[in-house]
């Protein structure tokens, strides 16, 4: 029996864009790694046998992007997922890092 495990898409492992593309910044210091584009992340995940990729809206499209930028980014990401056979089993909204949400936004009494 081998001690190594070689995952395949059948194992259904998924990874978040925010984990793979994390630049290494924290409250104690600035980023320490270069940015990785979402399409590069998709290619890398496919290479290691991942099933899919998860994301928050702003992991893919930065806050403040124009409609044209958004459409290009989404089209490129969708094409990369199709080209590499990755699913997107979870996409959600970031309701925690933008300052507008500092008081809970939707539940804030202010």
Predicted regions and their residues:
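N-terminal pre-domain/capping segments
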Residues: 1-110
């Amino acid at each position: 029996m081998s001690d190594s495990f070689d995952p395949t898409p059948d194992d259904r492992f998924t990874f978040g864009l925010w984990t793979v593309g994390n630049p290494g910044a924290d409250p104690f210091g600035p980023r320490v790694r270069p940015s990785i584009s979402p399409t590069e992340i998709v290619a890398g995940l496919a290479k290691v046998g991942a099933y899919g990729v998860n994301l928050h809206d702003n992991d893919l499209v930065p806050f403040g992007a124009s409609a044209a930028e958004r459409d290009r980014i989404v089209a490129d990401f969708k094409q990369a997922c199709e080209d590499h056979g990755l699913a997107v089993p979870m996409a959600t909204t970031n309701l925690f890092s933008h300052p507008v949400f500092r008081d809970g936004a939707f539940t804030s009494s202010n």
